[in-house]
Regions:
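Active-site-adjacent structural elements that line small-molecule/cofactor binding pockets in enzymes
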Residues: 1-129
Length: 129
């Protein structure tokens, strides 16, 4: 797996990796922002001699629950608006990413608490059903 959008790093790694991962800040934390990035990675795969379908797509999404304070970090890039953790918002968003070819999603929860994790249960149930 590689988690980069730098041209040089993609050229070095894409001939060898089985998957590529995107961070939420790179695509604005929504499907519409992800699509041009996906297309860019598809082009980078072809330049590296790979079919885009050979490289699994994964990404991280920022999801807010009650008590969210924002994700403080040393990252200098602007942070996108978080996705509301309510299943009515989160389920269609996750399905949209699946339709866009994303095979695996990591949810970056804000806050990272037992309550936030438990609040994901209806979303998981809806996606599993």
């Amino acid at each position: 797996m590689v988690g980069s959008i730098g041209d040089r790093m993609l050229a070095i790694t894409l001939p060898h990796v089985s998957s590529w991962n995107a961070w939420h800040a790179w695509f604005g934390n929504d499907v519409d922002g992800y699509l041009p990035l996906r297309d860019r990675i598809d082009d980078a795969c072809r330049k590296a001699g790979r079919e885009p379908a050979e490289v699994e797509r994964t990404l991280a999404l920022l999801v807010a629950f009650p008590g969210a304070l924002g994700r403080g970090s040393a990252v200098t890039e602007a942070q996108p608006d978080p996705i509301d953790g309510d299943p009515a918002t989160l389920v269609p968003m996750l399905r949209g990413f699946a339709e866009a070819g994303v095979a695996h999603v990591q949810l970056v929860l804000d806050p990272i608490t037992v309550e936030s994790i438990a609040a994901l249960e209806p979303t998981v149930a809806a996606l599993a059903g």
